[in-house]
Amino acid sequence: DDVENFEGNIVFAAVCDEEGNSGGMLSVVPELLKLREKENFDYLAVIDTDYSAPRYDGDDTRYVYVGTVGKLMPTFYIVGSEAHGGDPFKGIDPNQIAGAITNEINLNTKYSDIAEGEVCVPPITLRQQDLKTEYSVQTARTSYLYFNYGTHISTPDQVMEKVIDGANLAFQNVIDSLNAEYRKYCNLSGFPYEKLPWKARVMPYEKLYNLVKEEKGEEVDKLIDDLNEKLLDDPNIDERMFALKIVEEIHKMWSDKDPVVIVYFSPPYYPHIYVEGKNPLEEKLLNTVNEIVENTESKYDIEVKKFYPYISDLSYAAAPKETDAVDSLKSNMPGFGVKYSLPIEEMQKLNLPVVNIGPFGKDAHKFTERLQKDYSFNIAPKLVYDTIINLLK
């Protein structure tokens, strides 16, 4: 409260569109770097005041989160082999492969990141469909699906490796099941059985691009440039559809028409921020927040956790510095830098620890969404204030 003796600076940014791919936060990152250089600021941390909620039914704890969850969108473009509906064993159904990938990855805690006992929610499908545009008795040739994949510690290259392994397992399960059912069908029908010809193949988008580049040379890059220009003519095209169209067209150029699953990342990307205390800024933020929470008098049970569990603007206060992680993201996200961009280098330079101290409510994104007034308007603001003052001591 002693403003006259206040030392330090607070940079306030009104970034009101986290739901719109965090356009506000992404635009403020380079401005923060300019301000740091102009004013010779030594930034200490980023504080967000995003909504928090109970983590399970009956949970009455209030949470302060030092760090934030990340998000990737691993996407699977699945090429099967068409068949007539009356002779289905002559083909392989991409919808069946998609279903098997969903069964393997969807809500499977094997894919959950765990750090310091905090468990990330497992992946969940956000879309799954075949790409057949009309009715016919021919089975679909292609389908695709993508997952919301949260991270606490896994980088894009690590997630790519995990989901490729999962898709390979799923693809092989489909082939094994098809052969088993085809054998039964042949036995029931009195037909001779021969093992079906399918082989499980899964590869990242980067490998598909390189294989087509070997065949077509600069023609593939011209195709991408022309396609980018054409797709950008539609300002309303969805970023995920933009990426899909590029994968579709590059695959069409490939001479190999056998079944395959192409794995790539769709936008958006939210890096996780894991505040471990490995450097002075992280250590200071952790110590400050723990001290403030411990010494704040209230009727609430307030607990410090490591990862804000919902995607937030905090993700863009830093970015992975591992070359493999960044390269995997850029080379496996079709349309990166064209339709969808991130100031990754600026995020790496900013590189700040983060904390979320927000209001408490229930039923987020429902018509019954509401706030608990006392904590939200009395306790949370005090926590924010005390955190700022103590960081600047």
Kindly give the residue locations of the regions a language model identified:
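Acidic/histidine-rich catalytic neighborhood of metal-dependent amide-processing enzymes
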Residues: D1-G67
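Short glycine/proline-enriched loop/turn "hinge" motifs that connect secondary-structure elements
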Residues: V3-N5, V64-K71, Y135-R141, M253-D256, ...
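Predominant activation on well-ordered alpha-helical scaffold segments within soluble catalytic domains
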Residues: L26-V29, N95-N106, P381, Y385-I389
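Midchain, well-structured core segments that form catalytic/ion-binding scaffolds
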Residues: E37-K245
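An extended, acidic, His-containing surface patch that forms the Zn2+-binding/catalytic region
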Residues: R183-K393
